Structure formats: structure tokens, C-alpha cells
Amino acid sequence: MLPSAVGLEASDTLLSWKIGGLYKPAPNGSVYVNYALSQQPPGGANFTLSTAANNANNPNMDPQKAKTAELGTKWELMDKRLLLTGALFRTEITNEIVTNPDGTVGQTGKKIVQGLELGATGQISPAWGVTAGYTIQNTKVDTGATVAQDGSSGLTYTPKNAFSLWTSYQFPFGLTLAGGARYSGGLKRGTDGAVGTPNFTDAYWVFDAMASYRINKNADIQLNFYNLFDKEYVGAINKSGYRYFPGTPRSVRVSANFRF
């Protein structure tokens, strides 16, 4: 740890671990389960300790814990031309700092993130492939003060829905064409005294494309088109919403690949 101005020091030993299991009910399918516990000691986020009683970096505080559980499955269908995946996940973060009504602080804060992840990868023909993915997640402050400016119990900077789709086709003369779409739900900003900024960003769709040509077995050239319709969107925001990272505008990248 880096000492603060008053020269604080702290040392301890923490154990983070993960365990998992896999079961194959059929040759073409599997079911798995994972569980993990990770711990972050006071000062672990920025390697700085604090003497403030309500600060998570105070060495007298207990480590913050994250417990993550995942249950998923994978199946190969249609002579292995289609792969389907799905997973349920849940993460609980505990021991967060909470200010009590009497002004004292405790580590009763708890946040929860849980959701569902779906994926599909298919080969419609030897030349035509498709990949799709969808994630839905619910987030909330289970115990403690809300963190979102809109007053809801949801967490900030986390879209509820996300989707992606990509398809590609290989022509017999070395040309490959591909295209797809990306969707992200809106992002909530944090609570503070900012005035005039929205409580959340808008959801958005972005479309991309790609073309590549194989010159020979050792070289190919590739052309990527990002944000085809030049959609203006916010990729990320800070707590107040005064600063944000705009999404990538319409752009093109040319690259060459060589294999020896």
C-alpha cells in the first residue's frame, strides 16, 4: 500500500477462490456451474489508505466481497453446424460503506447484478456464417443509498440490454463480405449536484461492415467500415454527465495481413 500523508500501513492475508463443475448429459451438450469469491482489502482499488471513518480505504474496514455464481449450458446441433449457449449469472457485492440515519457508518451495503446471456453461432452453409448474442441484466442497490440520479435502485453505467449480430459470406474467388449490428441500452449516471445533464444516455444501434480479399495463401487485405450510418451516441459518461466519451463516428480502416 502507498502510505497517505499520515503514514498509514496495513497488512493482512485474503483468500479469493473459484470452483466449477461440468456435466455432459449428451455427447453434443454440456452443463456447467461456477462459483467464485473475490475480496478487495481497504485501499485495494487505488493502493491508498485513509483515516476517514466513512472511507472504504480505512484499514479498520473489512474487505469488500464479491460472490459470483453462474449456471450455463452449451449444445452443438445440426451436425455441429449450430452452437447454442446460455448462462444465468448473479453477483453480490457486500461490505460496502453505508451511512446510518444517526450519522454513523457501517458495512451493510449490498449490490446485486443478475441476468441471462444467450449466444448462437451457426454455419448456414460452408460459406455463410452467422453469430448472435444477447444479454439482459438487472442491477440494484439491495442495501444502502441509491447511486443513480433518476432515484431508482439500479446501478450506474450498466445497460439493461445488449445485443450483437454478425454475418459473413466467403465467395469462392477469395472475397469475404460481412456485416452486423450492435445494440446497447441506455446508461444511468450517478448522483451528485450536477444541473442540466440527463439522468441517463439514450440506447443506440450501430451497424458495421467488412470486406476482405485473399491475395494468396500468405496475404490478404481487409477493409472495415465502422458505424455505417454515422450514428451519434454516447459510449460512456462520468458521474455528473458533464463529461462523456462519444461513440466512434463513421470511419474506415484498411489493413493487410501476412502469414509466413
Per-segment meaning from a language model:
Residues 87-92, 107-192, 229, 255-259:
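Gram-negative outer-membrane beta-barrel transporters
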Residues 1-29, 42:
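Signature of Gram-negative outer-membrane beta-barrel scaffolds
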Residues 24, 30-38, 60-116, 120-142, ...:
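Membrane-embedded beta-barrel scaffold of Gram-negative outer-membrane proteins
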Residues 11-15, 65-69, 112-114, 153, ...:
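Residues that define the transmembrane beta-barrel architecture of outer-membrane proteins
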Residues 19-23, 71-75, 118-122, 132, ...:
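Residues on the lipid-exposed face of transmembrane beta-strands in outer-membrane beta-barrel proteins
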Residues 183-192, 212-260:
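C-terminal beta-signal and adjacent terminal beta-strands/loops
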Residues 27-29, 80-82, 126-128, 161-163, ...:
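Outer-envelope beta-barrel architecture signal
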Residues 1-3, 43-52, 96-104, 137, ...:
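Outer-membrane beta-barrel translocator domains and adjoining extracellular loop/strand segments
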